[in-house]
């Protein structure tokens, strides 16, 4: 584990014909104006506003789940998994922001291309990916101050957390990361947003070495690996239904109470705003929160960094 050196994220090419860059799908993108921007993902809608941009339309999750205050004039054009293509075109957009990890959105590339609508795909499972997206957005808006405030300053926050953890030289805890929803639960490795942060902080994710956990989450496998910390992220409209599933299918097992993580009180329900949705300008808070749970000995020092 090493605290990363501050990185300089490459600026998009600015020409007389607008801003040119390559998106997360590998598509070359040129955007000439961004007066009527449509975002098909709530977290990216927020990121665009953090860069000083305004939105003509976005999907339901931006308002109903993220709770973004985008004003009364903004149009809602379906959900992030079922965007209304007619409504998108009705907004007469000059730039559409899409999520590279939602298949229903990646399928829109040809449709938007044929309609002549400039668009780009992004994914932000790591802070560096968020920083690159913010760099592109701020190149459009010209708001270098917001890139500093919502990007580079956050990068420094993360570096401070990682440096503190690294210098403490504490034993690396074994952890289990669970993603729960109303009808089930899956163990997650390090190839997702929260898993990547845990790895950065030195945690050893038992699912990275035990593929059986990823394929079939069972109490027997969890008992065999006996993690020191268990982290739960819920998804879906009802957090309570996800927690009910866990209670009925995992916690009801008599062996659950014998797990080291449960006995030591190291079973944590993580904040969806920081660990399910993309934290954007709150990435530093996400890292501090996880670090304090992994290494409670450092809680006071981490709090001082806030």
PLM feature spans:
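Short helix-initiation/N-cap motifs at beta->coil->alpha
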Residues: 23-24, 75-85, 210-219
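A short, structured surface patch at a secondary-structure boundary
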Residues: 41-91, 95-102
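Extracytoplasmic ligand-binding site segments that recognize negatively charged/polar headgroups
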Residues: 104-107, 122-136, 170-193
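Bacterial Sec-exported substrate-binding components of ABC uptake systems
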Residues: 1-43, 145-176, 293-306
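Alpha-helical, coiled-coil/dimerization segments enriched in small aliphatic residues
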Residues: 62-64, 186-215
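A local structural motif
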Residues: 29-32, 68-76, 201-211
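Structured C-terminal subdomain patch of bacterial secreted/periplasmic proteins
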Residues: 129-141, 145-148, 234-306
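Solvent-exposed loop/turn segments at secondary-structure junctions
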Residues: 43-46, 61-64, 95-104, 125-129, ...
């Amino acid at each position: 584990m090493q605290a990363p050196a501050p990185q300089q994220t490459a600026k998009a090419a600015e020409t007389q014909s607008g801003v040119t860059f390559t998106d997360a799908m590998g598509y070359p993108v040129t955007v000439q104006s961004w007066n009527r921007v449509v975002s098909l993902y709530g977290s990216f809608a927020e990121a665009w506003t953090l860069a000083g941009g305004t939105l003509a339309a976005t999907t339901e999750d931006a308002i109903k789940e993220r709770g973004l205050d985008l004003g009364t004039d903004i149009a809602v054009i379906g959900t992030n998994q079922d965007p209304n293509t007619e409504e998108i075109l009705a907004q007469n957009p000059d730039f559409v922001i899409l999520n590279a990890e939602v298949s229903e959105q990646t399928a829109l590339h040809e449709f938007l291309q044929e309609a002549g609508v400039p668009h780009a795909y992004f994914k932000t499972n790591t802070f560096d990916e968020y920083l690159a997206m913010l760099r592109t957005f701020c190149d459009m808006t010209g708001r270098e101050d917001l890139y500093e405030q919502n990007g580079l300053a956050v990068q420094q926050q993360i570096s401070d957390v990682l440096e503190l953890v690294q210098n403490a030289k504490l034993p690396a805890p074994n952890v289990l990361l669970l993603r729960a929803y109303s009808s089930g639960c899956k163990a997650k490795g390090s190839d997702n947003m929260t898993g990547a942060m845990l790895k950065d902080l030195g945690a050893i994710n038992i699912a990275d070495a035990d593929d059986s956990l990823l394929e079939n989450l069972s109490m027997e496998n969890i008992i065999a690996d006996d993690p020191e910390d268990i982290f739960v992220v819920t998804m879906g409209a009802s957090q309570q239904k996800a927690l009910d599933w866990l209670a009925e299918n995992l916690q009801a097992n008599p062996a659950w109470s014998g797990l080291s993580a449960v006995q030591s009180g190291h079973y944590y329900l993580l904040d969806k705003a920081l660990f399910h949705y993309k934290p954007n300008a709150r990435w530093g808070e996400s890292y501090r929160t996880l670090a304090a749970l992994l290494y409670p000995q450092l809680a006071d020092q981490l709090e001082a960094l806030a």
